[in-house]
């Protein structure tokens, strides 16, 4: 085992967290953190940056460039046209005031369970959340936690039938399906939702007592998000139409088109619909598109360089040692599988990455262990999904970085809330899942 290399991974990750909390840009932060890993793991400096870092970064940027651009344009036009505000007002009138956080969590969960990509979800919900948060004076720093609680916990790996890739990866190896351990997953999802909402509401109240409320970013137009009796807004049903078409297109093409390709087409259709329906309401469409292009590149680049850091980590000897250790733990199959998946997911910053590495390396072995111990593979499926999601949202997580950059927040402002909703809550969910099976036999 490479002790120095493993220590280097810890130093690199610690440096990444420290510098991002100190307000450093993601580019120098990722380079400094990568250097710590490269030096302690005795890697070739040029090869590490030109191959491991650069390849991971460019692959991510190349794959998601159009998605980030189109998603940012769609979200920008929804806000500029008043459609996002119209939807927000309808939600407030239907559910009542004081439900801003609940609305964001529920809508995020519903869209995620419907198969909507996290990035599309962010671009779609943020304009609506701005109106809700401004109207109820909810600190914007709670938005990433609310969105990620809805989209990356119970709806992604808890609820049976979720189309999320994280819930589908185990199927091929374990011979299970998306509905594995339905009662267990449903009960765990209720626990996660309740804990997350309790935490968010409590934090909102604590921030209010401290005098901290909604503060718009430099790109947030108060005139577009402030609710007034004099607002001339499009009808809410018309406003929902572009979103509905976008979501339905992704849903119905999920098995016939590449996911990213389908999302790009859906966003293009959504943009065309917004322009056709609300052209007269958009003051300067070209300016809105140009601003969105700049904003999308900033968000994409900041996320891509963190993925580059992840590429360096995965190429290091320390990472190989961490994976070997995680996959060699001898204890109850459910417990060792959950710990192994969680550790690898934390190292990669990816639930899907952790699941894939675990299943590729030890999937067949754990099938034998579970069968010998009388453990249904359905419960193994559910437990490792929860474990992977429990430790994948560290500060170098791509989803978290994109959320804070796009919303003009900082890790220092937002991460402690995300840490609870997406690491503490999901880890508790994993423990509850294991206990429900071991104590009550609930699958």
Question: Across the structure, where does each feature detected by a protein language model lie?
Answer:
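Alpha-helical transmembrane segments of multi-pass membrane proteins
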Residues: 98-111, 138-155, 181-186, 190, ...
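Short helix-coil transition sites and intra-membrane helix breaks within transmembrane domains
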Residues: 23-26, 61-64, 75-85, 112-124, ...
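Hydrophobic alpha-helical transmembrane segments of multi-pass integral membrane proteins
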Residues: 67-70, 94-130, 304-306, 329-368, ...
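Re-entrant/interfacial helical elements at transmembrane boundaries that shape
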Residues: 72, 86-88, 120-132, 161-173, ...
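Hydrophobic core segments of alpha-helical transmembrane domains in multi-pass membrane transport
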Residues: 8-20, 31-39, 68-73, 107-112, ...
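Long, contiguous bundles of hydrophobic transmembrane helices that form the permeation core
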Residues: 2-9, 13, 40-41, 173, ...
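Core transmembrane alpha-helical segments of multi-pass membrane transporters/permeases
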Residues: 28, 50-85, 110, 259-320, ...
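Interfacial loop-to-transmembrane junctions
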Residues: 91, 293, 403-424
């Amino acid at each position: 085992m490479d002790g120095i290399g493993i220590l280097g991974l810890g130093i690199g990750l610690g440096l990444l967290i420290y510098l991002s909390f100190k307000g450093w840009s993601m580019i120098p932060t990722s380079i400094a953190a990568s250097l710590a890993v490269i030096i302690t793991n005795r890697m070739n400096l040029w090869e590490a940056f030109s191959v491991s870092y650069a390849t991971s970064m460019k692959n991510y940027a190349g794959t998601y460039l159009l998605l980030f651009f189109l998603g940012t344009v769609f979200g920008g036009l929804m806000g500029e046209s008043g459609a996002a505000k119209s939807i927000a007002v309808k939600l407030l009138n239907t559910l009542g005031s004081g439900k801003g956080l609940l609305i964001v969590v529920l809508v995020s969960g519903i869209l995620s369970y419907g198969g909507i990509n996290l990035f599309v979800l962010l671009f779609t919900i943020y304009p609506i959340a701005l109106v809700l948060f401004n109207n109820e004076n909810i600190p914007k720093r709670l938005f990433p936690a609310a969105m990620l609680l809805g989209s990356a916990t119970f709806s992604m790996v808890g609820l049976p039938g979720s189309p999320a890739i994280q819930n589908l990866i185990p199927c091929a190896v374990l011979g299970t399906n998306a509905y594995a351990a339905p009662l267990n997953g449903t009960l765990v999802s209720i626990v996660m939702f309740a804990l997350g909402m309790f935490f968010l509401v409590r934090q909102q109240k604590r921030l209010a007592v401290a005098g901290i409320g909604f503060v718009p970013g430099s790109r947030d137009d108060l005139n577009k998000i402030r609710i007034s009796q004099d607002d001339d807004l499009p009808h809410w049903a018309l406003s929902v139409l572009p979103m509905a078409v976008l979501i339905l297109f992704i849903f119905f093409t999920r098995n016939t088109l590449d996911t990213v390709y389908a999302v790009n087409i859906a966003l293009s259709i959504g943009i065309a619909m917004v322009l056709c329906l609300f052209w007269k309401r958009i003051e300067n469409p070209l300016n809105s598109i140009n601003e969105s292009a700049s904003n999308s590149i900033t968000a994409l680049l900041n996320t891509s360089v963190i993925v580059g850091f992840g590429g360096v980590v995965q190429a290091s000897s320390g990472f190989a040692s961490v994976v070997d250790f995680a996959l060699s733990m001898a204890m109850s199959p459910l417990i060792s599988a959950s710990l192994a998946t969680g550790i690898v997911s934390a190292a990669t910053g990816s639930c899907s990455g952790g699941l894939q590495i675990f299943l590729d390396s030890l999937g067949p072995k754990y099938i034998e262990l579970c069968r010998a111990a009388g453990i249904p593979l359905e419960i193994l499926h559910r437990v490792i999904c929860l474990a992977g999601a429990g430790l994948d949202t560290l500060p170098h997580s791509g989803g978290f970085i994109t959320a804070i950059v796009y919303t003009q927040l900082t890790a220092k402002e937002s991460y402690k809330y995300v840490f609870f909703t997406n690491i503490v809550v999901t880890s508790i969910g994993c423990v509850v899942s294991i206990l429900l099976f071991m104590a009550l036999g609930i699958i």
